[in-house]
A protein has these predicted regions:
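Predominantly extracellular beta-rich ligand-binding scaffolds that present long acidic/polar faces
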Residues: 1-147
Length: 147
């Protein structure tokens, strides 16, 4: 376990197992103010934000990148177990769900690109986010990225 605050990724991430846009394995961790706009690919436990998450606390996150894998693949978290979550949002992308497997605690809300590229969405996802139409293809960024 550990903690991380105000983390972002815009690059392509690929590997085999425990692959996330930000964290491969976040067991017993506290993570907040997170976003990923990069594509993520792996085999098992693959997620847009976290590949494998167990008994953690996570909040204020969004993901827009594509996610691809063979087993336990989710737009937000590949495998989620007994995690306290709040303010998780993902870009709607066909049939892929926010969680590959969700065993308690996981809730994430789908949004369209036009809904996400607004000041209202930046405020909704969390206080560390700001909207600047000239950055990040119009998706919100973390406040430290514009200082």
């Amino acid at each position: 376990g550990g903690s991380a605050n105000s983390v972002s990724n815009t690059a392509i991430i690929s590997g085999s197992n425990y692959i996330g846009g930000l964290f491969g394995n976040a067991d017993f961790s506290t993570t907040t103010s997170l976003y990923n706009t990069g594509d993520v690919a792996g085999s098992k436990f693959v997620g847009g934000i976290i590949g494998y998450n167990k008994e953690g606390v996570t909040s204020s996150a969004y993901s827009t990148g594509s996610v691809d894998g063979d087993s336990l693949v989710g737009l937000m978290i590949g495998y989620n177990y007994n995690t306290t979550m709040a303010d998780y949002y993902y870009l709607e992308q066909g049939a892929l769900e926010p969680f590959g497997e969700n065993n308690g605690g996981g809730v994430a809300t789908p949004k369209t690109a036009s809904e996400m590229k607004t000041e209202d969405f930046a405020e909704l996802v969390g206080e560390d986010f700001v909207y600047d139409s000239g950055l990040n293809d119009g998706y919100p960024v973390l406040s430290w990225e514009v200082e």
